[in-house]
Amino acid sequence: YILRVFFGIIIQLEWRVLMFLKRIELQGFKSFADKTVIQFDQDITGIVGPNGCGKSNVNDAIRWVLGEQSVKSLRSGTNMSDIIFSGSEYRKPVNMARVTLVFDNSTRVFDSDFDEIEITRQILRANNEASYFINKTPCRLKDINDLVMDTGLGKDSLSIITQGNISSFADAKPEDRRSLFEEAAGVAKYKK
């Protein structure tokens, strides 16, 4: 919400979408063996569907691109390369996982002159090392963290909540809840 105040009196309250995820491209990530593109519009607030259709894997993919380093949090074995599609009865395993998030940046929420921001992470089975990209340019995870810090996004953000995290958020210590709210509000960088 955008709130405009004049001499302590609310003069206008309006809803404005400042940024949204336009699409996610997944290839070789968990159950998404083939390249899959999911388009979103700015009115999407959640992902729903029957059990086993990949909702949690989409959520994991978003968190992974934004820097999640815990294989346990991604529900994937013991090695980060375990997130790579490992084959099935009818499909061979693939050698790489790549996920790209494409954000609308027409309002310049991200500190960039581009109308779209692409954030990509990929991993190769051969060396188990991740590569990161912003708008197809190689970068470090720190660069991605710096880019999203002001937006309320991040691997631990309240922007991305799984079913299991709702109860853990409610049971969290007050200081842990506060830091999540600070990240969601985009003020975490000012505490450093």
Where are these regions (language model features)?
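Gly/Lys-enriched N-terminal cap/neck module of very large, oligomeric protein machines
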Residues: 20-192
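Short, Lys/Arg-enriched N-terminal segments with co-localized hydrophobic residues
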Residues: 1-18
